[in-house]
Regions:
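Bacterial Sec-dependent N-terminal signal peptides
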Residues: 1-28
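Signature for phosphate-centric chemistry
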Residues: 27-163, 167-337, 341-432
Length: 432
């Protein structure tokens, strides 16, 4: 696909010309005007990936801070970058074994042959790398770190101390390493303290109890799945020269197609070209996206059905953010607190902080129209809280989600996307 190169080009261009600074308010985090999820997926079929979608960097702007305010501290939480599958029996391994006899028999169509050859490539790239960060994931975090440094240079001019903490899971530790390596490349004088350990999991990756909090979600998702039966016939005509002959090689059409969808979603994380979407009708992979999109939001975000019970589970992470921000405001001399974790805690965090769009409260029927998982919880998704102070000691905070200025639903800003820290702190501490 034409996917990562334009993103990389955009990052290089932004680094070359600098970030746009104007007096605009925060960027709209919903769907572009006049477009919906189907439109976005037709533009780029890899957007069916949801939380397996690679990071999309878009050109952005910075609203000027009020006169006299200078950035002095950043509080950050980042999901690990692109990874291989975390389950056993990866889809591409299963499909390679299943399709090899048909490939050797010469009954695959040109689309089917292309798919098989890319499946073989995925097996080679992913061999011995289950659950691991990929080179794409390393690149994502290095680029995010570089942009953060160049965007807020004044933070790191005032202080060189950076604390980084990670989930104990390898892909998070390596994401932390990639991010901090890029920061050090920007400024070798930075004093970066990196650690991981079980003690940090209590807030970085705290999801205990979410199953009980969202009891009933399975029933809703099963009903939705039943109401949207999948076409498991059309792919035979696309992948085989003779669909009837192809059926003899496929034992379970539904599971075969499910594995094909997994390959379509994961190939981008492994840096393998996508040829899989062309082997399925649009409706098949769109409906698969919709089911996963609804599942992610319903179980881990601020849903109307379960949000009041699910979101408070993220309180330890919010407490850590507030405590470390208070210390920075009090003058502990730290430039940034960095945290590297997972998608589920980050989704709950956006709901707890009440971030506009990504953390909004929607009912099950609204999810696909309001919340696009492929943007909202893609690989390397991140939150950056940037703190500003004037000579009088007044502190403002700007929230960036995936590097874009983002508003708080339930709180009036001081100006543009800037909030008074004392008001924002109080709002977050009193939620739930």
């Amino acid at each position: 696909m034409k996917h990562y190169r334009p993103i990389l080009a955009a990052a290089i261009l932004s680094a070359a010309i600098g970030f746009h600074t104007n007096d605009s308010y925060a960027q709209n985090y919903g769907y572009p005007e006049g477009k919906n999820a189907a439109d976005l997926i037709r533009e780029d079929t890899l957007r069916t990936g949801n939380n397996h979608h690679i990071y999309e960097y878009v050109d952005l702007h910075d609203t000027r801070a009020p006169k006299g305010y200078k950035a002095f501290y950043i509080s950050h939480y980042g999901r690990h970058g692109s990874r291989t599958d975390h389950r056993g029996n990866e889809a591409w391994v299963v499909l390679e074994k299943e399709l090899r006899p048909a490939y050797e028999a010469g009954i695959l169509s040109w689309k089917g042959r292309q798919a098989y050859e890319k499946i073989v490539e995925m097996c080679e790239v992913g061999d011995g790398m289950r659950e691991m960060l990929t080179p794409v994931g390393v690149r994502e975090h290095k680029e995010i770190a570089g942009r953060m440094y160049r965007r807020f240079r004044e933070v790191f001019r005032q202080s060189k101390e950076v604390e980084a903490r990670s989930s104990t899971v390898q892909r998070c530790v390596l994401s932390m390493g990639a991010f901090c390596t890029a920061l050090a490349a920007e400024d070798p004088k930075l004093d970066i303290d990196l650690l991981t350990g079980q003690r940090y999991m209590d807030y970085i990756a705290h999801t205990t109890g979410y199953g009980e909090a969202t009891a009933g979600s399975d029933k809703m998702l099963k009903a939705y799945k039943k109401a949207h039966p999948r076409d498991t016939v059309s792919f035979f005509a696309l992948m085989f020269n003779d669909p009837a002959e192809g059926r003899a090689f496929i034992k379970d059409a539904y599971h075969f197609e499910s594995n094909l969808i997994d390959c379509a979603n994961y190939c981008q994380c492994l840096g393998v070209e996508d040829v899989f979407h062309r082997c399925m009708p649009f409706e098949v992979y769109y409906d698969a996206w919709s089911l996963k999109n609804r599942s992610l939001y319903l179980v881990h975000c601020n849903s109307a059905e379960f949000g009041d019970k699910r979101i408070p589970i993220g309180k330890p992470l919010v407490d850590d953010i507030i405590a470390k921000a208070d210390a920075a405001v009090a003058g502990n001399g730290r430039a940034a607190d960095l945290r590297f974790g997972h998608d589920y805690p980050l989704m709950a965090l956006t709901g707890y902080l009440d971030l506009q769009g990504v953390g909004g409260r929607y009912s099950f029927d609204e999810i696909d129209d309001k919340w696009f998982g492929s943007w909202n919880i893609c690989m390397a998704s991140n939150l950056q809280l940037v703190f500003y102070r004037n000579r009088s000691g007044d502190v403002l905070v700007k929230c960036l989600y995936n590097e874009r200025e983002t508003l708080i639903n339930g709180l009036e800003p001081f100006y543009g996307p800037y909030y008074r820290w004392d008001e924002l702190r109080k709002y977050w501490m009193e939620r739930f």
